[in-house]
Amino acid sequence: MQLETQDALYVALELAIAALSVAGNVLVCAAVGTSSALQTPTNYFLVSLAAADVAVGLFAIPFAITISLGFCTDFHSCLFLACFVLVLTQSSIFSLLAVAVDRYLAILVPLRYKSLVTGTRARGVIAVLWVLAFGIGLTPFLGWNSKDSATANCTEPRDGTTNESCCLVKCLFENVVPMSYMVYFNFFGCVLPPLLIMLAIYIKIFLVACRQLQRTELMDHSRTTLQREIHAAKSLAMIVGIFALCWLPVHAINCVTLFQPAQAKDKPKWAMNTAILLSHANSVVNPIVYAYRNRDFRETFHKIISRYVLCQTDVKSGNGQSGAQPVLSMGL
């Protein structure tokens, strides 16, 4: 009974996270789509991040709930359910990395930034990073999976034959995706290096920006612009930090499972469920950060919610002017 209650609580929390993730990130996409002030290359990368978070709510979380229940299905169907969230995670990491590089260029070469980073180039980068994310996330389909061990203990074949490709396996993540892939390839190879690169980039951004601010010959306009860039970098660094805090626990558990299998056998189910919930909750956080840190996003969110959710026809922006467009800013 305790397990059933725990599973019910897990499913309820996952569904709540899914609903909030979809609502918040659809709002982000709508804000960028409707506000010319928000249509910048930086925000295109944030839309890519939001799209991944919408997919987490619509697909990855339902898949995770399905896997947590351990139903029986054929091996490759289960493998797809398990790998889909890896695609979205990798896309999020690449989008965050692209934003970090974008902000680095804005600080390092401000005079050439607009010619280097255009909307067309940003959309091209987004297309490439999604292709890479699918390639990395679906790598287990190339053979790095647990098919041999999973099918060795499968239930009776679906068609009544002894063909192992038709047999049913208990669909649990660890039954189909080996921890060696999750730790060595996914975490050490595809998650940790980009996070460390982003850490180095943001440290460099703040060092360069602080040196420039200390220059007494800076014009007031240049100083104001630089301060806006620093504010944007702080907001984006906050998003990266929250991403790391939300995802590192589940990767830490994976490392323990691989390197200390004896101890991992006794790991409580609630610990893994909590780590998974925390990783999924990351998809809810970003719209809150945007609203808190950026006036353009905050005002556009207010206008969209007032007009399309509350059905108010006379929508006033944060400056009290009816229908006023958000003031253009340098970013978050």
Swiss-Prot record:
Subcellular location: Cell membrane
Transmembrane annotation, as ranges: 9-33, 44-67, 79-101, 122-144, 179-203, 236-259, 268-291
Name of the gene this protein is made from: ADORA2B
Known glycosylation sites: N153, N163
Membrane topology of the entry: Multi-pass membrane protein
GO cellular component terms listed in the entry, alphabetical order: plasma membrane
GO terms assigned for molecular function: G protein-coupled adenosine receptor activity
Positions where lipid (S-palmitoyl cysteine) attaches: C311
SMART domains xrefs: 7TM_GPCR_Srsx
Cysteine disulfide links: C78-C171
The protein's name in its UniProt record: Adenosine receptor A2b
Extracellular face of the membrane: 1-8, 68-78, 145-178, 260-267
Family: Belongs to the G-protein coupled receptor 1 family.
Topology Cytoplasmic: residue spans: 34-43, 102-121, 204-235, 292-332
Top-level taxon: Eukaryota
Protein role: Receptor for adenosine. The activity of this receptor is mediated by G proteins which activate adenylyl cyclase.
CDD domains per UniProt: 7tmA_Adenosine_R_A2B
Gene Ontology biological process terms from the UniProt entry: adenylate cyclase-activating G protein-coupled receptor signaling pathway; regulation of cell communication; regulation of signaling; vasodilation
Binding positions (adenosine): E174, N254, S279, H280
Pfam families cross-referenced by the UniProt entry: 7tm_1
Xref: PANTHER family: ADENOSINE RECEPTOR A2B, OLFACTORY RECEPTOR AND ADENOSINE RECEPTOR
Keywords, in A-Z order: Cell membrane, Disulfide bond, G-protein coupled receptor, Glycoprotein, Lipoprotein, Membrane, Palmitate, Receptor, Transducer, Transmembrane, Transmembrane helix
Family matches, as InterPro entries: Adeno_A2B_rcpt, Adenosn_rcpt, GPCR_Rhodpsn, GPCR_Rhodpsn_7TM
